[in-house]
Structure formats: structure tokens, C-alpha cells
Amino acid sequence: STQVVNFAQGEFLLIGAWVCWAMLVHFGLPFWLGFVLTLAFMFVFGILLQMVVLRPMIGEPIISVIMLTIGLSIFFKAGISWIFGEYVQPFPSVFPRESINIWGLNVQTAYLMSFVISLLIMVGFYAFFKYSRMGLAMRATAFDQQVAASLGISVHRVFALAWAISAVVSAVAGVTIGIVNGVS
């Protein structure tokens, strides 16, 4: 709904994966708690990023905002490398390692869970955008920001929520990829 291509999206994925990894490995939290705290962290991270860095860019040429997201990508990538290093770190074992046989095809549990999580997110997004007030507000804002604002929709709030959702979904992807491949 912000009409901005986020070139730092991949780094959101990395940040989410590393935050969850740190909560599990360094703080010794159980997976479910570390995962929920990671999602909460990324939600706040997305809102703060939009409010502090991107909101001042409203009204600027779109290329300036795109260049800003490229700069954020470089900044986040360098920060992650500086904090966590360049080496792959294995994620603690979350799902059983054995495979499940589905119609003669052996599928690892982690891949199956990633697929199920993806389906749940898709269904959740469908319901959110179709039936919730905020989902409808986001659709209206994406269609026409001025009309949405004239209807009483807080465009700034919609933008902040869009970036928060983007960060949360990226964190989910980062954690599921990290479980399978490790974090690097």
C-alpha cells in the first residue's frame, strides 16, 4: 500500500532469522517463545523504520525512497555481518529430522512445516484484506492515498502497519529458511 519497492526486504528476512537464532542459542528460550518474541520485535522494528526513516520521505520523488531502501539493505547487511559474522550458524533442532512419506514421496518435516506455515499466512492475508477494517483501509490506501485520507483513513498508520507486516512475514520466512539451511 506504500507504493515503494523495498530493496531491504531480504535483510528483514535475515534480521528476523538472526534475532530468533540469538533468542534460542544465546538466551536459551524455547522455540515457541523465541519465535513469538521475534515476531513482536520485527513488528515494532517495521513500525519504527517506517516512522523514523521512511515517513520523512513522503512527498519526495519515488526514486529517492527506492534509493533509501537500497541504502538500508547495505546498512543492514553490513550490520548483520559485523554482529554475527560471515559463517553459517546451525539453527537449533525444532522439528524432528525424519521424513514423512506422502504418496510415496519422502518430505522432511521442516519442509512440510514451511509449506503449512506458508498456506496459513496466505489464508490469513486473504481474510485480513477481505474482511478486516484495517485490511480494507490498506487496500483503499494502495488504490488511492488521497481518497483514502479523505474517507478518514490514517494513511500514515496504514503505511506503518504495511511495513510492520512486511517485517513480520519476512521474519517468518527467515526462521523457516534458517531451520532448514542455517543462518548466515
Please provide the spans of the model-predicted regions:
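Extracellular/periplasmic helix-loop junction at the C-terminal end of a transmembrane helix
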Residues: 70, 74-103
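Single transmembrane alpha-helix segments in multi-pass membrane proteins
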Residues: 1-25, 48-64, 139, 157
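Alpha-helical transmembrane segments of polytopic integral membrane proteins
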Residues: 1, 20, 45-51, 72, ...
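Glycine-rich phosphate-binding loops of nucleotide-dependent enzymes
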Residues: 4-7, 42, 104, 144
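Alpha-helical transmembrane segments within multi-pass membrane transporters and channels
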Residues: 29-72, 79
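Alpha-helical transmembrane segments in multi-pass membrane proteins
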Residues: 12, 16-20, 34, 38, ...
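Helix-loop-helix "hairpin" substructures at the membrane interface of multi-pass membrane proteins
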Residues: 106-184
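Interfacial loop-to-helix junctions that mark the boundaries of transmembrane helices
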Residues: 27-36, 58-60, 101-114, 182-184
